[in-house]
Amino acid sequence: VLLYGHLDKQPEMTGWFEGLGPWTPVLKGDKLYGRGGADDGYAAYASLTAIRALREAGGKHARCVVLIEACEESGSYD
């Protein structure tokens, strides 16, 4: 099983709501707003954490390959 994730974020942009900037996460109600919150940066962490939890619980799984890159997934040059 291939688990893919990229760590890059989109460039800082305008259009944020008042009090919501691109670099400081803010909790409003039950929602967390922050830079890259809707991007893929935490998918790799979630995948690795899930594999670890499964192993610690004694579960079995197929061979997992985790691919993490730091470039934009639509135009990776390296």
What is each PLM-predicted segment?
Residues 61-78:
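Histidine/acidic-residue-rich, glycine-tolerant segments that coordinate divalent metal ions
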Residues 2-65:
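Active-site metal-coordination/substrate-binding segment of hydrolases
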